[in-house]
Regions:
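P-loop NTPase switch module centered on the Walker A-proximal segment
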Residues: 1-90, 94-103, 200
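P-loop NTPase catalytic nucleotide-binding module
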Residues: 1-18, 28, 36-37, 104-224
Length: 224
């Protein structure tokens, strides 16, 4: 049996408290690398096992998980976000292929992500921004994007658009494929049609994405 077609090293970086380790645990669980998903208040399965990490309920050293997804072998690296520990994460960045910058959905706190974004730019490491805890957010998605743009030296291109119902987050739209997905507790998301009351905003978000891409990547724009 053939092995994975390629391998990638992916680092999760971002401010302390943004939920990197919980996301790290979720990714490992969804990929089938661990039998259950750990949480900060219950103990992590693959996250930092040190006594200090358990006492502080935060990552204090880099931890790794190896998963295979869609014929790609991934080494996921969870890095500390606390200011006094951030050098731990910096030490591994030169060896990664991609970074995921995890942030909270609070515009006023987005400035805490600026040092991570600037460092990734300096090291020329491709990166995406993952807005975590959207189910707890009371801020508009567009306002959050503007907050990210204020601290990023690179153009910010939205990839997914959140779908809300009242105070609940029920799904998202992939702006590349224009396919909507509905969240299913404890299960994979299921495909659904873009809700009528979100169609105009989805089209606006997609147009904004294409307009941004047109400014700096014609080849990618044509592919879409």
């Amino acid at each position: 049996m053939d092995g994975p077609s390629r391998t990638l090293n992916v680092a999760l970086v971002g401010p302390a408290g943004s939920g990197k380790t919980t996301l790290f645990e979720s990714l490992a669980y969804i990929a089938g690398a661990v039998p259950r998903r750990g949480r900060a208040n219950e103990g992590f399965v693959v996250g930092d096992p040190s006594p200090e990490a358990k006492a502080r309920q935060m990552t204090t050293e880099v931890t790794a998980a190896h998963v295979v997804h869609d014929d790609v072998e991934l080494t996921l690296l969870d890095t500390p976000g606390a200011v006094e520990l951030v050098q731990e994460g910096r030490n591994v960045l030169p060896g990664v292929d991609l970074a995921i910058v995890v942030v909270e959905p609070v515009g006023e706190r987005m400035v805490a992500a600026a040092p991570f974004l600037h460092l990734l730019d300096a090291l020329d490491i491709p990166h995406v921004v993952f807005i975590n805890k959207m189910d707890r957010s009371d801020q508009r998605y567009r306002d959050l994007l503007e907050s990210i743009r204020m601290v990023s030296a690179r153009p910010v291109v939205p990839h997914q658009y959140a779908i809300g119902r009242g105070e609940s987050l029920v799904g998202y739209v992939d702006l590349l494929t224009e396919q909507a997905y509905q969240y299913q507790p404890g299960k994979a998301s299921s495909a659904m049609a873009v809700p009528e009351d979100h169609r105009e905003r989805e089209q606006q978000a997609r147009a904004e994405m294409l307009e941004t891409l047109a400014d700096f990547d014609d080849d990618l724009l044509e592919a879409l």
